[in-house]
Amino acid sequence: MDSLTGSQIIGQQLSDHGDEKYRATSAFSGEPMAPFFRNASEGEVDRAVCLARDASDFWATASPDVKSKFLRELAQRVNASREKLLNRASLETGYPEPRLTMELDRSLFQLGVFANLVEEGSWVDAIIDQRKANQAGPPQPDLRRMLRPVGPVGVFGASNFPFAISVIGNDVVSAWAAGCPVVVKGHPGHPGTCELLGRCVQDVIRSKNLPEGIFSLVQGTQNRVGEALVQHPSIRAIGFTGSLRGGKSLWALTQKRPEPIPFFAELGSLNPTLAFPAIFRRNTSDFTKNLLASLTIGNGQMCTRPGFVFYVKCRETEQWTQELLTAASLAPQQPLLNTSVASQFAEATEQYRVQLDARQIFPLQTKDEPKSEFDASPPSLHLYQVTAAEVLRCGAKWTEAFGPVCILVGCKDLEEMKAITNTLPGGLTLSLHADPAEQTLAAQWLSDWTAKFGRIVWNDFPTGVPIGNATQHGGPYPASFDGQGTSIGTRAIERFARPTCYQNFPETLLPPELQSDNPRHIWRQVDGRLTQDKLPH
């Protein structure tokens, strides 16, 4: 792979029409790094989307074999560039190599998962109601329904996952698997990593002689680049992972279009952890160790980080708090992703103090000292403590802080714990730590939790999100705009497909998945029964 160019990747072309230049910043030194990148021009965004539109019919009807081979070859191509990718991503994010290696391996695995999904083919949810003339009531026509790709998709990469939620990340791969060309808006925090990944995609598309519009990458620090993408009339859906503020701004633009489009956004979540009393009446060392690991992985820059721990105050919880503080002093530290994240982290933690009347218990506050414009010292884990009564008195103004921080909320009894958790906004996860004897109590609260959270965790922590068939990564607002879908796991493909029904169609005009002979041998629901059988003509 050649060295970085700072160019946009528009189909098979490298483009440099933008005027404003910028550079990535080292997470370790704060120094700008080569090369200069350009903010994509409106013309470059338009060209990328038009190429995607032109490739749409081909990719929508391409065989499962073509799509799966593309995904598998891309995994091989990215893996061959592993060393260069890891080196650049570490400089741009500050993540240590083991953390990045794990993320890259996960992303390569995800490509294989979706290749398998496409090959098997049943994800299209084919449903057939055969013609019924001899039944009570009017005759029923032949109805055949399946999921079809929506068309070109715009995807916004995230700051905290340079591989897994980026150019080859979950939104992009699930859109490709659904049959949608993709235009990626790279995150300005790691533009070099984005370009290196984009060149891998470009190489595979060229080597397999596929339409160039299946993929383009536009980059920039200016809001206008993303705004041009979401407002382009040929974009049919958006995938976004980022802040609530940024997501709301882009969502508003999609709804102001002459034809509003779906905006699938993963925004933010408090991820409360509820610790029932029995937890503290036994050895809490594993609970403490695993909580800290969940809080500090990626330096707390995870959308599933457990931001609040609720418990009933007693002598045992006082002892546990001291145990937690001792363990926190040994927690690993690393830089935050960039100065913007650091600034927002400082602002959010200050809001905890002001809006929730929370008291910082780790690290102990010291007199402010002058700092340089770039402070390369990693922020330590921040722990705050507050009572439920104080939070309720302050109006329960819940705010997410993106970084290594957790609020310990002490409740006078279980009734107060239930009262305060009922004020929580929608979220990605809720975790419950309890003894088997407390299952009856948990059952009484469960319906409240399922109404607000996408994934409910029993005696575990929420940071790990497996790429599975049952995975749910999404939840009611403000975790997502549409809590009915998931952005991780095989079901993520359904966001970029919509149902189409064919009534009384001749066999020759039906997609293979709906033809009576079932040439792709997929599972289908026929007259209410799952089967892979052929149907009589």
List the model feature ranges, each with a label.
Residues 34-39, 55-61, 135-136, 154-155, ...:
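Short, well-ordered beta-strand elements within core beta-sheets of diverse protein domains
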Residues 373-377, 414-510:
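C-terminal core of ALDH-fold dehydrogenases
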Residues 1-141:
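N-terminal Rossmann-like NAD(P)+-binding subdomain of aldehyde/semialdehyde dehydrogenases
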Residues 122-292, 310, 314-317, 535-536:
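Rossmann-like NAD(P) dinucleotide-binding subdomain of oxidoreductase/dehydrogenase enzymes
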Residues 70, 178-193, 214, 259-277, ...:
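Short loop-to-beta-strand entry elements in the cores of soluble alpha/beta enzymes
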